[in-house]
UniProtKB/Swiss-Prot annotation:
The keyword Transferase does not apply. Pathway: Cell wall biogenesis; peptidoglycan biosynthesis. It catalyses: UDP-N-acetyl-alpha-D-muramate + L-alanine + ATP = UDP-N-acetyl-alpha-D-muramoyl-L-alanine + ADP + phosphate + H(+). Gene3D superfamilies: Mur ligase, C-terminal domain, Mur-like, catalytic domain, NAD(P)-binding Rossmann-like Domain. Belongs to the MurCDEF family. GO terms for cellular component: cytoplasm. It is found in: Cytoplasm. This is UDP-N-acetylmuramate--L-alanine ligase. The gene is murC.
Amino acid sequence: MLETPKVLLKNLQDCKIHFIGIGGIGISGLAKYLKAQGATISGSDIAISPSVKYLKALGVEINIPHDPKAINNQDVIIHSAIIKEDNKEIQRAKELEIPILSRKDALYSILKDKRVFSVCGAHGKSSITAMLSAICPSFGAIIGAHSKEFDSNVRESANDSLVFEADESDSSFLFSNPYAAIVPNTEPEHLEHYGHDLERFFFAYEYFLDHAQKRVIYKEDPFLKNYSKNAIVLEKKDIYNIQYILKDGEPYTSFELKDLGAFLVWGLGEHNATNASLAILSALDELHLEEIRNNLLNFKGIKKRFDILQKNALILIDDYAHHPTEISATLKSARIYANLLNTQEKIIVIWQAHKYSRLMDNLEEFKKCFSEHCDRLIILPVYSASEVKRDIDLKAHFKHYNPTFIDRVRKKGDFLELLVNDNVVETIEKGFVIGFGAGDITYQLRGEM
């Protein structure tokens, strides 16, 4: 059983909450949500980010970088998982005896009275959460990415029902109070949090599912296919007549689901149809079928997921994929998109590995995942995400792709410049380029750094 956090948030209208690491997508979502609930929010981070700018525009006082002077009369401190005990603001809060909560513990208070549609899995959870949010427009939403439908990762609502993207990386999904547990897959990742113990990892998913009133699962997953308790089940054979089209220049997937008829969803690929199907099945008890079918059309994608930045002489796509399974699936979508556009351009991949631990844990899979639909591979330095640097010979491991190694990429007008030692070594003026990574590659591709 989970231990209930000793500190609970209540009377939000009178509550002063300080977030350490407020620029992160998960923490910024909670900050926006609690501000809308009436709490007084402040925060800090190590650098300016789009989330920090957004919150500042809402009137949130944010210190860059962390500053112990920012800790004074707050009622509670909430910090992201990456913040360590020796953080100056954490130390100051302890001196002042201000209660300190991790994001994981804070979730219990925030969600305990909500009817939560909690989406968790290794891949696809942001898309499913955003799709379900589009299908159920009266529900609140907290997503780990920006929905293009409402241009935010948070949608406030007076409705008790909330669509929530849960996180397995720190086991915080176990604190999400799921009314409905929606799980597309359980591919092992973040095993360092689970002591590299697969039994412990899968037990967490089982606990998550067991404690929901409603369960929606994709039974092609090796773990989920053996889940024995009552659940709404999706299988690969339930999705058929998949077709890909351009509608007003935008990519869409058309498919039929079980005996429910045809659906149309933004995006490309079988995985896109699977994600949409799980969202649809999750909403069948909430809305009439035709409402679900029509509302799904409001989904316009999410930022950094097959995010088409431009489509002229240079087609440029930014994608968050940072795991081999995700990269392989998205490359298939890229090839489909190229075919729909009738372009003969080769697909150029710019890849920024995210975390040394993930790269090392999945190295053999990474070495294979570019083998299809990637005509040229360009490799950026590993984005460490605060991990200690490890020695790894990427040139040796990826030599079979004859890759180009660069220090960074820079957007210059409609072109991309490849740089080594701050010198431009190549300019890409036309073609089909897709960038992969969960680090700062997204800002490089957008010309924001």
